[in-house]
Curated annotation (Swiss-Prot):
The lineage of its organism: Bacteria, Pseudomonadati, Pseudomonadota, Alphaproteobacteria, Hyphomicrobiales. Keywords: Electron transport, Nitrogen fixation, Plasmid, Transport. It comes from Rhizobium meliloti (strain 1021). May play a role in a redox process involved in nitrogen fixation. This is Protein FixA. It comes from the Bacteria. FixA and FixB form a heterodimer. GO terms for biological process: nitrogen fixation. One of its GO terms (molecular function) is electron transfer activity. Gene3D superfamilies: HUPs. InterPro entries: ET-Flavoprotein_bsu_CS, ETF_a/b_N, ETF_b, ETF_beta_N, Rossmann-like_a/b/a_fold. SMART domains: ETF. Belongs to the ETF beta-subunit/FixA family.
């Protein structure tokens, strides 16, 4: 079984800072991590490999420093790592990113064997779009299972996979044929501790580095800014709002008087609310017959 896992190196969101003047993200000095949802995908792929055998290939698109994320994935137990790096990829939005990764996965299939399952995280913590995984599936014509919490089983004979998928209000048990693409949720299983032999093997393993041409991308115009119909116009910090607290003495006061005082205080801070409520005929506190 051949499992391909897409990962991304992202800034540690707990330590991201925004420049107070330019309102841009200050990346200098901010440590990077593997996207948490991608770690969940990697762990699920490694578990399948433990159960059914096979190999796990990790792939990422990014600058040369993204090799650090791939080497970390190798220490967890991945067998092979591919870095897709080229100046043509700079400024890629989700459409251009899914195109480049789909081309790379197709090339991985030609070079190392067709993937049975392609894994991605549900989304990245620096983009939060959840679009790249489905975009890859569409380009590779793969069935897609999104928001997956757990892989329940793989039937090698019938070439089918069964998963538990989170849905609004509960969970779904879904089954589809292989090959397919799965987007994993963070939190299902923590990434394993790498073993010593995995760390030693990772140190000896050479990361495969592909340019756009190496990945079979004949037309770089589909990549990077040229292939991106969307561009981030501005990154900004939310404006702070002064919060006020008001203490009201309710000692030995009837409920009606307390309610009227609270409503008057709210209307004093938000005059527009009084106008809106007045237009619906809802003014003042409701009648209170008794205290309870």
């Amino acid at each position: 079984m051949h499992l391909v896992v897409c990962i991304k190196q992202v800034p540690d969101s707990a330590q991201i800072r925004v420049h107070p003047v330019t309102n841009t993200i200050m990346r200098q000095g901010v440590p990077t991590i593997i996207n948490p949802h991608d770690l969940a995908a990697l762990e699920e792929a490694l578990k399948l490999c433990d159960t059914y055998g096979g190999e796990v290939t990790v792939v990422t698109m990014g600058p040369k420093m993204a090799e650090d994320a791939l080497r970390k994935a190798l220490t967890f137990g991945a067998h092979r790592a591919v870095l897709l790096t080229d100046r043509h990829f700079a400024g890629s939005d989700t459409l251009a990113t899914s195109f480049a990764l789909a081309q790379a996965i197709a090339e991985i299939g030609e070079t190392f064997g067709t993937p049975d399952v392609v894994f991605t995280g549900k989304q990245t913590i620096d983009g939060d779009t959840a679009q790249v995984g489905p975009g890859i599936a569409k380009r590779l014509d793969l069935q897609q299972l999104t928001y997956v919490a757990k892989i329940l089983s793989i039937d090698a004979a019938s070439r089918e996979i069964t998963v538990e998928r989170r849905a609004e209000g509960g969970s779904q048990i879904l089954r589809t044929g292989l090959p397919c693409l799965v987007t994993m949720l963070d939190g299902a299983d923590a990434i394993r501790r790498g073993r010593l032999d995995d760390a030693l093997r990772a140190a000896r393993t050479k990361v495969v580095k592909w340019s756009a041409a190496d990945a079979g991308i004949a037309e770089p115009a589909n990549c990077g800014l040229r292939g991106s119909p969307t561009v981030v116009k501005r990154v900004f910090a939310p404006t702070s709002r002064e919060q006020k607290a008001r203490q009201i003495d309710t000692t030995n006061k009837p409920l009606r008087e307390i309610a009227d005082g609270l409503i008057a205080a709210i209307f004093a801070d938000r005059p527009a609310l009084k106008h809106d409520l007045g237009s619906t005929g809802q003014q003042g506190a409701p009648d209170v017959d008794r205290e309870s």
